[in-house]
Regions:
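Surface-exposed loop/edge segments in extracytoplasmic proteins
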Residues: 13-19, 50-51
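A short, charged, amphipathic alpha-helix used as a generic interaction element across diverse proteins
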Residues: 12, 22-47
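Short aromatic-glycine-(Arg/Gly/Cys) micro-motifs in beta-strand/loop hairpins
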Residues: 1-15
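Short, mixed-charge low-complexity intrinsically disordered segments
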Residues: 36-66
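Secondary-structure transition/turn motif
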Residues: 9-10, 21, 53-57
Length: 66
């Protein structure tokens, strides 16, 4: 079973909230909700691979390497 961890960040790049799901679609919906609340959110799978993001990535987080 795969897990998806979504982390929300404020405009300073500070993590505000994290949630883990086993369903990729639920993780996508949570990512969108978090981005609306905090400005940016990204979802990673159990191996740390990028699975999605919404919002404007804060400069403090640096450039994402895919």
């Amino acid at each position: 079973m795969n897990t998806f961890t979504t982390t929300a960040y404020n405009t300073l790049g500070e993590a505000q909230e994290t949630e883990t799901q086993t369903d990729s679609w639920t993780a996508t919906e949570i990512c969108l909700d978090f981005s609306m609340l905090y400005g940016y959110a990204e979802t990673l799978d159990a191996w740390g691979r990028h699975a999605g993001e919404y919002g404007d990535r804060p400069a403090a987080l640096g450039q994402r390497a895919y």
